[in-house]
């Protein structure tokens, strides 16, 4: 499979906003933000980042690939856990500096490394003048210890 090459974004804002060439606008680290939701029910699953290679692999294979900022490398989401993300649709925002993946999750139907369906399982509430976290979805679809050995 040959590597997709993305053209440089146009300086003309209207060209970015219309149909035509997809010219993603990567940040100064070479990354683009990826918002990921469930293709069936629309639940927000995760927010991640992609470099050009991860984005190209995602488009070409139909399986979500991301760039890990902490590990400094590309990873196929779900490769270890079995919770692969099959991409059903990819959208971009008006100025092409963020993308939205609508996915189906295989395996345990979990996206978060904690074993939960979504990485957004906590709310933030102000108590006694201090921001605090509350867990609102504690259902584990798998045990991270069993899957990752952590």
From Swiss-Prot:
| Entry EC no(s) | 3.5.4.19
Q: Where does Zn(2+) bind?
A: 94, 112, 119
List the record's Gene Ontology CC terms alphabetically.
cytoplasm
Cofactor requirements of the protein: Mg(2+); Zn(2+)
Reactions catalysed, semicolon-separated, are: 1-(5-phospho-beta-D-ribosyl)-5'-AMP + H2O = 1-(5-phospho-beta-D-ribosyl)-5-[(5-phospho-beta-D-ribosylamino)methylideneamino]imidazole-4-carboxamide
Bound how, and how many: what does the cofactor note say? Binds 1 Mg(2+) ion per subunit.
Query: Which residues participate in Mg(2+) binding?
Result: 93, 95, 97
Class of enzymatic activity (EC top level)? hydrolase
Coarsely, its chief localization is cytoplasm
Is the keyword Metal-binding in the record? yes
Q: By its UniProt entry, which Pfam families does this protein fall under?
A: PRA-CH (PF01502)
Q: Which UniProt keywords apply?
A: Amino-acid biosynthesis, Cytoplasm, Histidine biosynthesis, Hydrolase, Magnesium, Metal-binding, Zinc
Q: Name one GO molecular function term.
A: phosphoribosyl-AMP cyclohydrolase activity
Biological processes per GO annotation: L-histidine biosynthetic process
Q: Please report which protein family the annotation says this sequence is part of.
A: Belongs to the PRA-CH family.
Q: How does it assemble?
A: Homodimer.
In Swiss-Prot or TrEMBL terms, this protein is called: Phosphoribosyl-AMP cyclohydrolase
Q: Which organism is it from?
A: Rhizobium leguminosarum bv. trifolii (strain WSM2304)
């Amino acid at each position: 499979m040959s590597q997709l090459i993305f053209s440089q974004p146009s300086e003309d804002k209207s060209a970015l906003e219309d149909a035509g060439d997809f010219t993603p606008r990567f940040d100064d680290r070479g990354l683009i933000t990826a918002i990921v939701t469930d293709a069936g029910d629309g639940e927000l699953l995760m927010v991640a980042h992609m470099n050009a290679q991860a984005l190209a692999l995602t488009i070409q294979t139909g399986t979500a690939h991301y760039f890990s900022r902490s590990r400094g490398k590309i990873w196929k989401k779900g490769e270890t856990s079995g919770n692969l993300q099959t991409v059903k649709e990819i959208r971009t925002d008006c100025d092409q500096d963020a993308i939205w993946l609508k996915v189906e999750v295989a395996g345990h139907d979990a996206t978060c490394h904690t074993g939960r369906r979504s990485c957004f399982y906590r709310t933030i509430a102000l108590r006694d003048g201090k921001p605090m976290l509350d867990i609102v979805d504690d259902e584990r679809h798998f045990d991270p210890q069993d899957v990752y050995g952590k």
